[in-house]
Amino acid sequence: MSGNGVPTSHLRAVVRLVLYMGWTLLLVPVQMAAVLLNLSFARVIPIIYHRGCLFLFGISVFIRGEPVRGAPVLFVANHCGYLDIAIMGALVPCVFVAKMEISQWPFFGILARLQRTVFINRQDHLRTGTQRDILQNHLAAGENLILFPEGTSSDGNRAMEFK
């Protein structure tokens, strides 16, 4: 506990949250300009952002195996929580694929759009082919895609049904 009776873990959490908000507010305008001006480093800023987030939250990532080189990859992973995005986004230059509803979320929706997330309308079965073509175009352009097909997060103890 700190001297005023507040648990140190609470203070640490508040400090990390304030640092996270500062880090986010610092990089959002830079990324916004990079995306609007179609600058090549608009693909690099999200990696820097996610690595900074992991650092601020004290998260270390250990990688087993070798990354695929020379060809774009569609990564399909179970979604255990919001940190999955920071972890995956810190490891590879990528475009996330997310359900359309996320684009309307007040805070994370803005961050997702700035990272050039592809939003999929899972209810519109008539546009499945068009949405598939959009994903293929990203792969053809050499971009890695990251997809969490469950459509939600879980506790990570079991694989959920893909949607």
Question: Predicted segment positions?
Answer:
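Soluble catalytic domains of membrane acyltransferases
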Residues: 55-163
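A transmembrane-helix-recognition feature enriched in membrane-embedded lipid enzymes
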Residues: 2-62, 110-115
